[in-house]
UniProtKB/Swiss-Prot annotation:
GO terms for biological process: cellular response to acidic pH; cellular response to magnesium starvation; negative regulation of protein catabolic process. GO terms for cellular component: cytoplasm. It is found in: Cytoplasm. InterPro entries: Anti-adapter_IraM, PmrD_sf. The gene is iraM. Inhibits RpoS proteolysis by regulating RssB activity, thereby increasing the stability of the sigma stress factor RpoS during magnesium starvation. May also be involved in the early steps of isoprenoid biosynthesis, possibly through its role as RssB regulator. Belongs to the IraM/RssC family. Keywords: Cytoplasm, Stress response. The keyword Cell membrane does not apply. This is Anti-adapter protein IraM.
Length: 107
């Protein structure tokens, strides 16, 4: 089954992410990974992680739940990344970020 990413919230210091996705219904997945699932990406879950753009990536999926608008709003409001100051300097202020490539193009 293919899943389409609608939106993603990341916590850069621990690699925890939440994505609103569409499969056979709208869901929220809670996972940990060193990759970013940008909106519009299409992936297939497999036993060892996911397949994204014909490449397998390890991720740990902790929980999948039906989409809840209030929960998603809460997750979005507590998002650490990108911090507002970074938009001005183009530099990431998270010295301990474990995401390999910044999804926001920061350095």
């Amino acid at each position: 089954m293919k899943w389409i990413v609608i939106d993603t919230v990341i916590q850069p210091t621990c690699g925890i992410s939440f994505s609103a996705i569409w499969g056979n219904m709208k869901m929220i997945i809670w996972y940990q990974s060193t990759i970013f699932l940008p909106p519009g990406s299409i992936f297939t879950p497999v036993k060892s992680g996911i397949i994204l753009k014909d490449k397998e990536y390890p991720i740990t999926i902790y929980h999948i739940a039906p989409f809840n608008k209030d929960l998603w709003s809460l997750l979005k409001s507590s998002q650490e990344c990108p911090p507002g100051e970074s938009k001005i300097t183009n530099k990431c202020l998270h010295n301990s970020c474990i995401i390999k490539i910044c999804p926001y193009g920061l350095k």
